[in-house]
Every structure is written in C-alpha cells, then in structure tokens.
Amino acid sequence: MSWDQVWIDINIATMSPNISEPYGAIRDAALAVKDGKIAWIGKRCDLPEFDVLATPIYKGKNGWLTPGLIDAHTHLVFAGNRANEFELRLQGASYEEIARNGGGIISTVNACREADEAELFELGRQRLNALAKEGVTTVEIKSGYGLDIETELKILRVARELGKHHHVDVKTTFLGAHAIPPEYKNDSDAYVDLVINEMLPQVIAENLADAVDVFCENIAFSLAQTERVLTAAKNAGLDIKLHAEQLSNLGGSEMAAKLGAKSVDHIEYLDEDGVKALSESGTCATLLPGAFYFLRETQLPPIELLRQYKVPMVVASDYNPGSSPLCSSLLMLNMACTLMRLTPEEALAGMTRNAAKALGIEAEVGVLETGMTADFCLWNISTPAELSYTYGVGSCIEVVKNGRLVHQ
Ligand code: NIG
Ligand code: FE
C-alpha cells in the first residue's frame, strides 16, 4: 500500500450511519490518507501492510478523531457591533422593538455599507481563525447586511475571498432578503423586486452564492414575498434555505420544504404539520442555540417531533452581531445539549453529518469513510461526549484539511 499519511493510536467517531455503534465509533483504529481522501479506515489490527519507512505516521495518543466540524449557518462577514442593543435589551427592550425602531439588522447594515472590502476581510479572517481553532473545516457565510446591490455583492465577494485564502472551506449564501432597508420602508414589495430582478442575476453572474436564504418573519418578509424569492432562486438552480419560525409561526418552513429547501433554520415555533413537511422533503432542521440563548427565548424548537419524524437536526452558531455574537462552534454543541436537550451524539451529528447534508456536500464531508475527503480533527478526549460536555479547554489538538495537516 502506498499512502500519504497514516494515523494510529486513535479511536474514531466516524459519525457514519453504516456503523451501528454510537458515534459510528471504531476503537483502537487506524486511518490512511491518499491524495486528500480517506484511503483506508478500520481497526488497527486490520490495517494492511504499508511502507513504514516511506510513510509519515501520526500517533494520536489514544485520543479521538472526528470529522472536521461544519458550521452550516453564520453571518460572519460584518462590521461594527451591537453592544449598545445588548444593554437596551437588558433594560427591557425586546429584539423586535429594537428592530422596529431602526436598530437591529439595520444598524449592522449601516456599518457594512461604510466598511471597505479589506476591513471586512480582516474581520472575517479573525472570526474564521477562531472557528478553525475549534476544529471547524467548513463554514457557511451569508450576506444580508448590505441590502443594496453594492454592499450585498461586497459581502459575498469577501466571503468567497475568505474561502480562497483560508484552509476552511466557505459556502456562501445570498440573504438579500434579510430585512427591509430604510429606502424601501413603505414598499417592501419593490425591495423584493430588486432582490429578484437585479441582485440575484448579478450574484449568479459573478458566481457569488451557492444558496439563497430569506428571513421570513413579521419583522422581515411575508410568506408570499419569501416564496417569490425562493422560487426565483430555485429556478436559477441555486440551493434554497430559510430563516423561519424564529419569533412566530408564519408557515415558512412548510412552504420552503415543499420547494425542496436544504434546511430551515431557527424553527422555535414550528408545529407538527411543519415537521411532517420537512420529513417528506428531506429538509434539515437547523437549531441555533446561540440565538436561543442570547435572545433568552423560552419557546424550544420541537425536538421530540423532529426525532419522531426522523428530520436531520443540524447545530450551527448563527454567529452574528445581533442575536448570536458567540463565535464558537463547540459552545453550540454544549448549548444544544443543555438548552435544547439534544444528546451529545445528536449534537455532534448536527455539526458533521447533518450539517454536510444542509449544505449539499454530504457526498464529500461530514462522515469519516473510505473515499470521503480527509477533513478530520484529533481531540484530546477520552469519550466523544466530552466535546459537548466541557468547553474552553482547547481539546482540539490537530486538524487535517484535504489530507494536509493544518498548523494552527
Ligand atoms: O439568524 N434572524 C435573522 N437573522 C439573524 C440575526 C441578525 C441580526 O440580528 O443581526 C439570525 O438570528
Ligand atoms: Fe441567522
């Protein structure tokens, strides 16, 4: 056998559904990499003979390998911050009131319109570094803090550039319909026209987005407006997804599922009909515990129904300055368990296998199996549940991306 690298003295949480052990675990395992892919994975005692003198061998000190983490929902390219709104909320103002009074998303829009690409890139790079340190190897980044053609394109270009210059892979999502900009305050339909007829074609022409998202909510876009944007995106061949049922139930998830959305995200107010629709269409349910925590929500997403209907649950950071200023994926694993009562195994599946599905990249990443991309992390832990049990101890000790060891 001729391999580029071999890992031994490891246990592996493959997260493969084809291995019946919890976490798809293989204890006393070995893994071999060739040309950026997993060439062999299994029990150490079954490892075929290979040229030990010509092959770099990495010893995992009996820690655990997991798939590289995938943060499938972030807004990490933005300028400014909203600490002032945090203070207002602690004095009693609600997230919705602040948004209705011209703060919220619009205040970040103002900061992004003023920032140049270099500034946004540097801010984004620092945030990507923070996620990468915790074992994230793929991230989704949304626009949505521009709300005019120039700034929406600027944010998406920066997101694409980050993907080119950082080892973390970046999937981009056009979220032009994130909020109604002040210029269209009294004519939101005209803004939706702009998103569909002018922004979307330019985003497509420059190949700036892999998917399209909308914020379907009383303080943002109606069900009918959301359907128009998602239909246009789908017709253009892009993946679709939705911020839905975060503060109320407008039926967005059900509609998006019927259009074949990859995921619906937040979904605190989703009901059983909605869950059924997700299960029928294979749409993922993305749980965002950071926003749930930071907005001090009390309405939990319908976790038990999602389990019952076997809807794949995704866990993501939703990193953004307003509702989840928490740039940590591992913290989300902990919160998914403590606040939303996922099992540690469900939480990890939400940041690996199911997150890959939500981004449409499940054929390449998200589980450790032969033929998959060699994106994985070595953790200094004695059981995979430790990933969501403890936080802040820096247990990610090595990251391999596309078969290359990344020095962090
Ligand atoms: O995912 N819900 C809408 N959008 C973001 C929040 C954006 C903001 O407040 O800046 C979210 O929570
Ligand atoms: Fe979000």
Curated annotation (Swiss-Prot):
Role, per record: Catalyzes the hydrolytic cleavage of the carbon-nitrogen bond in imidazolone-5-propanoate to yield N-formimidoyl-L-glutamate. It is the third step in the universal histidine degradation pathway.
For whether the record's keyword set contains Iron, the answer is yes
For the ligand (Fe(3+)), the binding residues are: 73, 75, 243, 318
Which CDD domains does this entry report, sorted A to Z?
Answer: Imidazolone-5PH
Query: What S-S linkages are listed for this chain?
Result: none
Which biological process annotations from GO are given for this protein? L-histidine catabolic process to glutamate and formamide; L-histidine catabolic process to glutamate and formate
The primary location reported for this protein is cytoplasm
Spell out the SUPFAM superfamilies in the cross-references: Composite domain of metallo-dependent hydrolases, Metallo-dependent hydrolases
Cytoplasm: present as a keyword of the record? yes
What does the entry list as the binding residues for 4-imidazolone-5-propanoate?
A: 82, 145, 178, 246, 323
Listed cofactors: Zn(2+); Fe(3+)
> Which EC class heads this enzyme's classification?
hydrolase
Identify the residues that bind Zn(2+): 73, 75, 243, 318
Catalytic activity of the protein = 4-imidazolone-5-propanoate + H2O = N-formimidoyl-L-glutamate
Gene Ontology cellular-component terms for this entry are: cytoplasm
**Entry keyword set:** Cytoplasm, Histidine metabolism, Hydrolase, Iron, Metal-binding, Zinc
Q: How is the cofactor bound?
A: Binds 1 zinc or iron ion per subunit.
Q: What is this enzyme's EC?
A: 3.5.2.7
Q: In which pathway does it act?
A: Amino-acid degradation; L-histidine degradation into L-glutamate; N-formimidoyl-L-glutamate from L-histidine: step 3/3
Please list the residues that bind N-formimidoyl-L-glutamate: 145, 320, 322
What is this organism's lineage? Bacteria, Pseudomonadati, Pseudomonadota, Gammaproteobacteria, Alteromonadales
Provide the protein name.
Imidazolonepropionase
Q: Which organism is it from?
A: Shewanella piezotolerans (strain WP3 / JCM 13877)
